[in-house]
Curated annotation (Swiss-Prot):
Disulfide bonds join C50-C92, C234-C518, C355-C362, C400-C407, C500-C519, C504-C522, C525-C537, C540-C553, C632-C721. It is found in: Cell membrane; Synapse; Cell projection, Dendrite. The keyword Lipoprotein does not apply. It holds the Pfam family NCD3G. InterPro entries: ANF_lig-bd_rcpt, GPCR_3, GPCR_3_9-Cys_dom, GPCR_3_9-Cys_sf, GPCR_3_C, GPCR_3_CS, GPCR_3_mGluR2, GPCR_3_mtglu_rcpt. Residues 591-604, 656-679, 748-760, 820-872 are cytoplasmic. The chain crosses the membrane at residues 568-590, 605-625, 637-655, 680-700, 726-747, 761-783, 794-819. It comes from Homo sapiens (Human). GO terms for cellular component: astrocyte projection; axon; dendrite; glutamatergic synapse; plasma membrane; postsynaptic membrane; presynaptic membrane. This is Metabotropic glutamate receptor 2. The lineage of its organism: Eukaryota, Metazoa, Chordata, Craniata, Vertebrata. Keywords: Cell membrane, Cell projection, Disulfide bond, G-protein coupled receptor, Glycoprotein, Membrane, Receptor, Signal, Synapse, Transducer, Transmembrane, Transmembrane helix.
Amino acid sequence: MGSLLALLALLLLWGAVAEGPAKKVLTLEGDLVLGGLFPVHQKGGPAEDCGPVNEHRGIQRLEAMLFALDRINRDPHLLPGVRLGAHILDSCSKDTHALEQALDFVRASLSRGADGSRHICPDGSYATHGDAPTAITGVIGGSYSDVSIQVANLLRLFQIPQISYASTSAKLSDKSRYDYFARTVPPDFFQAKAMAEILRFFNWTYVSTVASEGDYGETGIEAFELEARARNICVATSEKVGRAMSRAAFEGVVRALLQKPSARVAVLFTRSEDARELLAASQRLNASFTWVASDGWGALESVVAGSEGAAEGAITIELASYPISDFASYFQSLDPWNNSRNPWFREFWEQRFRCSFRQRDCAAHSLRAVPFEQESKIMFVVNAVYAMAHALHNMHRALCPNTTRLCDAMRPVNGRRLYKDFVLNVKFDAPFRPADTHNEVRFDRFGDGIGRYNIFTYLRAGSGRYRYQKVGYWAEGLTLDTSLIPWASPSAGPLPASRCSEPCLQNEVKSVQPGEVCCWLCIPCQPYEYRLDEFTCADCGLGYWPNASLTGCFELPQEYIRWGDAWAVGPVTIACLGALATLFVLGVFVRHNATPVVKASGRELCYILLGGVFLCYCMTFIFIAKPSTAVCTLRRLGLGTAFSVCYSALLTKTNRIARIFGGAREGAQRPRFISPASQVAICLALISGQLLIVVAWLVVEAPGTGKETAPERREVVTLRCNHRDASMLGSLAYNVLLIALCTLYAFKTRKCPENFNEAKFIGFTMYTTCIIWLAFLPIFYVTSSDYRVQTTTMCVSVSLSGSVVLGCLFAPKLHIILFQPQKNVVSHRAPTSRFGSAAARASSSLGQGSGSQFVPTVCNGREVVDSTTSSL
């Protein structure tokens, strides 16, 4: 039913056309007739269909079809015995006019059924036409995509194959709608892909687009935008140019492009006349863009004529083709007198040479006398005609194998079989190709030609003239020689930019607004982050740092104090001097072990005390050493133990003095546990308390090493022992108790007689120690963020603690031993008056309360020496 309605509509339309004015038609007789549809004229104004003669896309392409038919008809190997004719019409570059003209192609089919059979009248006779319309075997054309789409919709109803030489709309690849259409050119999505790759090559990510109204421009720009999105290229604004736009309207389009100053590149998918008007408007407005144009512009001089300045620097695309020298010779030999078969040639001649046949001033002109520019798609016109001829040749061989004439099987030609079995399967070497090129004509399963494009730039040559320069090609991939592009050569400076946002620095990522992949803010990564991708900063993690390129992370070297560091030299020097001094004191005491000063000092406790002081100095080396499990164990064990050895010995000393004189004042018996063995036992018991604490600490918190990074200095990884500062100071709490008790006893015995002024020196030692510790603790906590300062503070504090003991307690004794040896002898004196009364009172009280009497005596005016105090 739908086909009948369409047929009725066509009949009515045909009748209306038949009643109109006579039209020009180029007709060549032949056994098989091919239709031709060419834009002989440009578009007319609003009140007329046709405008001026279109020299390149109209006359040249039409003559290319005639040239190809002449060669085929003379070829003894291609359709021998069969002559091809032609029925060529003018589309006037307009789809509606082309559809009216194309009704000529189906007139003969109207007298046949859809299967090719002729209509039978009620009386049994075949229907006939009064003017005997020519049966069209196939159609070559049209040129513009919107023309081909309209004509293809008509021809498919009558199963007439169609091969276009220039229509590139992607819509025409849809075989469900255009099932009798083929073309020798590729579809626009290949061209769109090539244009998108050019933009990506130059890093143009923010562009404007202009498309012609109609299928060519609209479907082409849609395909481009699809390819652009796949490459993260954004469209700033999309404009359209219409068929009947005024100069002011084109200027409005240019102003709209100027509203997006960041988009310096404009992509054109326009017909040649639209591109010409757009360039002219840009020239008038003094607007400058970098144009990237489709094959609608191509390499046509007519597009840029008069607007060369506005077009300079443009990149244009054109289907890869080669000029046919035989056609050039053929075309230049034509004139109105030897080419009367072309009804439009006289009109072309008058327009080309600005002459008039009425005035008879056209005979003096010749095409050989003027520059000739072969239109870029001449090759595709010739290939289209040859493709139809090869398909008919193969069909003739299959259906008429025994004759060179047409047989009944091809009267009429079955268009469906011709297209499906022969046109789509045709394959041959392109005619008239240069000897050094290989160009095969064939169609894919969609009826499309194979895609290859030449890429040009429009530049100003050294002579000041403008010209097109081929700079590359696209054949499933882009190849460009940028040295041929003036603004892209290495000596030209930075490339023209067309982007919404500037590229982010190496240490920055993009913060993109939703839906805007080309416009972003640059957000710097943190120093400890690397770029996971262009949108994300990722944390390297503690102990790691981003590499120079910010593509990944590397493990930071572990920092600890080396022996050669300035932070180590000072503490180690102090420790070495202190250790040597301690060994020297020990040596002096051992050498003078039996002298009164050494004996009166309490030799056993002095040696223990010297051992503790030596341990204090040794702790510096343990704290400076590279942390390891063994070193960390020694740090925990050694620090508290060194202090406990010192302060346990001092506490034992001060406690003994306090008990002795406390008992003397009260007249008590001799105090218990004041013998050397008892004193050593008490001291060791006090030391063992610290050892128990340390062992418990080691069990609860196993020693080891760990990496430590301060939040504010993550680029520094410190190798440290795994204990907490609080744990370390907690382990010293026992020593704080010893110091407090020792200081208390030293304070209580501060008023002892001068013979017992060792208590005074112990007091000095403890007071100084308290000051050191009160200064050390806050410094230790405050400097916890800098392991070097903290370690140095610890080492110096421990060494100072040992030095105070060494200086306050042992220096006076050493002075007597070395420089006042006369005082280091045993002599007996009477009690001094200051001590006598106290001794008497102590003696009196002791006599009343105990069986034995404890009476201290004075030796050398300094120390108490008797059977019970000889070891002080």
